[in-house]
């Protein structure tokens, strides 16, 4: 059983049962949560806010389905991180080579000036 979070324009949210998805982890988690809620509070105290929350969500502003898993979600981010990493390595190598050549040129000029004296 899947669940959907709906967030309205005021920032309030509620859990909505989604009968099209069957996720045993979510079902077990929800069952234990409900069992804990019923064990600690009365049935009416739990059911009343839950029913009231469902009636307030006619037009959700953001709807996030927690059971949809897409393998390509993080692929673009990973490729961008790899590209930036390679770019930084290239820039570091170019800077190192430039500093090395500059120091080598300065040392050579210094030794040549000492030899001329």
UniProtKB/Swiss-Prot annotation:
GO cellular component terms, A-Z: host cell membrane; membrane; virion component
Membrane topology: Single-pass membrane protein
Location in or out of the cell: Host membrane; Virion
Disulfide bond entries: none
Main location: host cell
Glycosylation sites (chain numbering): 29, 65
Keywords on record: Glycoprotein, Host membrane, Membrane, Transmembrane, Transmembrane helix, Virion
Transmembrane segments: 71-91
Similarity remark: Belongs to the asfivirus B117L family.
Protein name: Uncharacterized protein B117L
Source organism of the structure: African swine fever virus (strain Badajoz 1971 Vero-adapted)
């Amino acid at each position: 059983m899947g669940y959907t979070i709906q967030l309205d324009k005021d920032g309030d949210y509620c859990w909505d049962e989604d009968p099209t998805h069957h996720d045993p982890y979510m079902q077990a988690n929800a069952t234990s949560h409900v069992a804990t809620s019923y064990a600690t509070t009365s049935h009416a105290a739990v059911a009343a806010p839950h029913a009231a929350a469902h009636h307030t969500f006619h037009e959700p502003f953001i709807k996030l389905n927690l059971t949809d898993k897409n393998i390509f979600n993080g692929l673009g981010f990973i490729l961008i991180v790899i590209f930036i990493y390679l770019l930084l390595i290239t820039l570091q190598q170019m800077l190192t080579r430039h500093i090395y050549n500059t120091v080598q040129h300065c040392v050579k000029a210094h030794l040549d000036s000492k030899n001329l004296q």
